[in-house]
Amino acid sequence: MKASRFFIGTLKEAPADAEIVSHKLMVRAGMIRRVAGGIYNYLPVGLRSIRKVEAIVREEMNRAGAIELLMPAVQPAELWQESGRWEQYGPELLRFKDRKDNDFVIGPTHEEVVTDIARNQIKSYRQMPVNFYQIQTKFRDEIRPRFGVMRGREFIMKDAYSFDKDAAGLNESYRKMYDAYVRIFSRLGLEFRAVAADSGSIGGNFSHEFHVIADTGEDAIAYCPTSEFAANVEAAEALPLIAERAAPAEAMEKVATPGKAKCEAVAELLSIPLERTIKSIVLATDNEGAEPTIWLVMLRGDHDLNEIKVSKLPGLKNHRFATEQEIVEWFGTPPGYLGPVGTKKPVKVIADRTVANMSDFVVGANEVDYHIAGVNWGRDLPEPDVADVRNVKKGDPSPDGKGVIDICRGIEVGHVFQLGTKYSEAMGATFLDESGKPQPMLMGCYGVGITRILGAAIEQNFDDRGIIWPESIAPFEVVLCPMGYDRSDLVRETADKLYAELVAAGIDVILDDRGERPGVMFADWELIGVPHRLVIGERGLKEGKIEYQGRRDAEATLLPADTAAATVAEKIRAALAH
């Protein structure tokens, strides 16, 4: 590719609405331009990287035995009504009517459409396993699109859907996709972690997320540096931090805590560790035609509630936070001084695992400006229902018993689910088994955010000059920067020869023949993030040398002109192999 025949739309300044590095650099590097909120044009530089991501994803999906198809972006409402998601999905689902007043949606996912394909095309167990995938544009009407391609409304995604006759088959399909994702993100040259996760609105039983590690990531990941354990903080099991409850050592005592409504303030006033205080959180579940059930969830003062874990407990699937009016009615006091001792009306108490093993702890007295110290289970309170209801935190024991938890930030770029029969039962996707009896198909679903990967890769790979692409997804692998291409025959002939050698070696190279000043050339290609640069100058050529600099290198080095192309080609092959 010659730069004079390519579109390079670099900018010196980022737009005012760009908040994070990837958004700023994608605009400045001429990769994207905003059309509307969360909707972008992908300019030639950006599209080249997208196509490279797609190629790797496609190769690994095919290698894993998945079969490519293409489903429509526009889907009839009837399919979503069959699955139940027409009512369940919120305003993120873009709905519209055609000229005949029929309801349609712009697909954010394709579970319904692919299940419709399966129920019409798969009739026998002999036709399974099968795994369909597509790479397609989707739309989710985010309430507040931001961060460029990281949380856009329109995005490109690879989604795959497996169909199996039994659980063993589903497990095998899931394993193949999991392994394929590990290969994909390894080939993309990204630091990533596969983490156990909650299935969210997609539904299903078993789930892993793939996160690119980045300080700007929206998700907190709990992992163990000395083992294989990794999980989304929402899904990570929080082990009890006290192995065995100690015998009571204090008498229960009401203490004045004027104006101290927070655990930290109470601990400071009483000169006790924060770990001896209890955080009381009041939840409610509604009962048709009757007053709500009120739940008191007890956490250690330094711990945070995990609502996803709570929602999986019996009776709490549709919980909400209690209103202040309900809190006063059941406890006799506003929030800040709540506790399980002496409530006005009966409440259901759930203690986190760590709280259940505590003794001599401090709780609210259900009276403004007072707490109760020296509280103990069995003596002062009945034994509680016990559950894991908190987020893990740094320093907790790892659930696999092989070390302690650390926390990092990640950007979700892939997700694999075992859906089971959630959609096949709802939509009647059955097959005849070996005995001729109809059975629901077991499904898995597997997504990769193609355009999101670009943003995540940049968040992990940049400096103050611009993007630093991994070789596998860089818009170009090498840029040739000739000094005086239009003035020096020697420079032009050498640059053209290098270009031909690199093309022949299968290297994705661009020759900057625009006639720009060196500073402009260097700034453009450093901003765009091309991993390798060769500078061809007349002075160096007279000594048989060409200047080479990798995008991550602090200094340039000189290479023999006659072997420069081969040297750079080998560097690229080594990077891709690694």
Curated annotation (Swiss-Prot):
It holds the Pfam family HGTP_anticodon. One of its GO terms (biological process) is prolyl-tRNA aminoacylation. SUPFAM superfamilies: Class II aaRS ABD-related (SSF52954), Class II aaRS and biotin synthetases (SSF55681), YbaK/ProRS associated domain (SSF55826). Its main location: cytoplasm. It is an enzyme of class 6 (ligase). The keyword Protein biosynthesis applies. PROSITE patterns: AA_TRNA_LIGASE_II (PS50862). Keywords: Aminoacyl-tRNA synthetase, ATP-binding, Cytoplasm, Ligase, Nucleotide-binding, Protein biosynthesis. InterPro entries: aa-tRNA-synt_IIb, aa-tRNA-synth_II, aa-tRNA-synth_II/BPL/LPL, Anticodon-bd, Anticodon-bd_dom_sf, Pro-tRNA-ligase_IIa, Pro-tRNA-synth_IIa_bac-type, Pro-tRNA-Synthase_IIa_type1. Its EC number is 6.1.1.15. It is found in: Cytoplasm. Belongs to the class-II aminoacyl-tRNA synthetase family. ProS type 1 subfamily. This is Proline--tRNA ligase. The gene is proS.
